[in-house]
Amino acid sequence: MSILRFASVTREIGAFVILDAIEGAVALGDRIGLVGPNGAGKTTMLRLAAGRDEPDRGTVVRKRALSIGLLAQEAHFDAAFMAAPDLRTAVRTGAAHLDAMAEELAAFERDGRVAQHAYADLQHRYEVLGGYTLDQRVEATLSGLGFTRDEWVRPPTGLSGGEQTRAALARLVIADPDLLLLDEPTNHLDLDALEWLEEHLRRRSGSLVVASHDRAFLDATVTRVWELRDRRLTGFRGDYSAYHRQREERDVRAAKDAGTQAEQIAREQELVQRYRSHRKFSKMHEHEARLERLQAERREAPRQSRRLALPHSALAGGGPARSG
């Protein structure tokens, strides 16, 4: 069952079509890598999924009450985050719903007239959602993403650009939405933080769509791949390496089909000219009709694009190099 679906979604910016009637669905527990050349529309897709932008045509269908978290390439924080006295408190604002539940539990405890079953139900939900371990999880997340204990007590207003991105990621980890959307999340992570994030994403039960140029990261975290190419979306099963093999096989088949079709078109053009020169117009019209059908169905050979061959993060300058 899908929790989010792109239904014939088209997105245009001025005269340019960025996405053209794309179709795709995210199921509960999916971990999807979103790949394609720079400018293909990956960020646009993530913003549409998050509801930050609206499609020009088509619909983004979301499951009712679906919680969505988006990590943009440039972090933007709300007033609650920026007003926090320190980084640890700021990151904790990602779990504001748990703090609200804790206040409700405290109110129940002060009011002896509250039904015991209502209190027990709320307490159980609070425990299942990790309320009793929230402080430990905040500290573990900050440590995992490379923040030292000294940095935990710094005000969020003093964060650098890279620190802001890591802080935004930490807050999303604590929020733990049903659908996590990440746009180039490895950009400001060292190797230890990168490996911590990979392990976290593999463990979490929620769904994930991540746009990244880091092949090793995608191999470590995703089980499906969406490829954006020429304004269209194509899905593949498996990690990045499996996708790359499937894409190469598909491109070889497409190139062969395009070559065969080009030969057929050339042959029909030759016959049209031959019958025209001999004034055999009935035959000429017959082959003109065949030629029109072939040209209408014409398949182009896949275009080779160096940008589409995703580099390792070290080559792209987007993260740490790895061995192995």
Label every model-predicted segment.
Residues 246-271, 284-298:
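Intracellular alpha-helical coupling/juxtamembrane segments of multi-pass membrane proteins
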Residues 269-274, 280, 292, 308-314:
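Alpha-helical coupling/stalk and coiled-coil linker elements that connect catalytic or binding modules
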Residues 116-123, 266-274:
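A short, surface-exposed helix-loop junction/capping segment
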Residues 104-106, 138-139, 287, 303-307:
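Short coil/turn segments at secondary-structure boundaries
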Residues 153-154, 277-281:
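Short, surface-exposed loop/turn segments at secondary-structure junctions
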Residues 300-318:
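Short, flexible cytosolic linker that couples an ABC transmembrane/permease module to its adjacent nucleotide-binding
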Residues 105, 112, 126, 133, ...:
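Leucine-rich amphipathic alpha-helices with coiled-coil/heptad-repeat character
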Residues 1-254, 313, 318-324:
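ABC ATP-binding cassette signature C-motif
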